[in-house]
């Protein structure tokens, strides 16, 4: 018995075969680049200061499907002036079948952003270079550590809802 797999996609997983974690789709949800002081900013000899903001959002799409969005904003200041602002929202749809809520929460908080991060890194670097600035490479992020910190904060607040507890999206 054989299963046909087309164009490199994973074969559908039957819930009866056991737990499964699948990447259904990866896509850019939003992208923006602004350089409000170009072209005069290119002549500045000021050491730039960078500020990185990272955010993750999870939305349940169905019983076994979740959208995870990894949002990154990188702001570069040259003295009092903004050199650029690069924003990327990289998203993925992930299938999680036959897993307990705690395992789902861990996967949504660690593995999903780890899968999306290389796409974010590449997009940020490409945007900045296309804007006429030297490349910037986002350094690896310890999503496991961030998840552990989030979990600790949730416990301090009295069991706030997990990532897997969100309601399915759609028309109500």
UniProtKB/Swiss-Prot annotation:
It is found in: Cytoplasm. GO terms for molecular function: unfolded protein binding. Belongs to the SecB family. Keywords: Chaperone, Cytoplasm, Protein transport, Translocation, Transport. Homotetramer, a dimer of dimers. One homotetramer interacts with 1 SecA dimer. This is Protein-export protein SecB. GO terms for cellular component: cytoplasm. Its main location: cytoplasm. The keyword RNA-binding does not apply. It comes from the Bacteria.
